[in-house]
Amino acid sequence: MMVLAGDWTDLKCNVSGYPKPTITWLRAGTPIDMNNPKYVVLPSGSLRIYGLTPADSGIYSCEASNPLGKARRPVELSVQGKNTVNDLIALK
């Protein structure tokens, strides 16, 4: 998935199961700090990331688990810098 720097995006995580699975979001295999206001897990389980920068690029994974097991789905996020008029002038 490719997005522009400065934007926000939702990484989808559609899960179902019984008992209801718990969702954990990871980046590069490490749980994301949900105390950081940059990240919000929506009621659907999707991860919303605000204020994207190229440093946010990487592999994110949605992990769903319950007492019967767990499953993980990775998604690659690529954040591209925005071209500005100043950038274009500098390239001449």
Where are these regions (language model features)?
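Surface-exposed loop and edge beta-strand positions of immunoglobulin-like domains
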Residues: 14-16, 50, 65
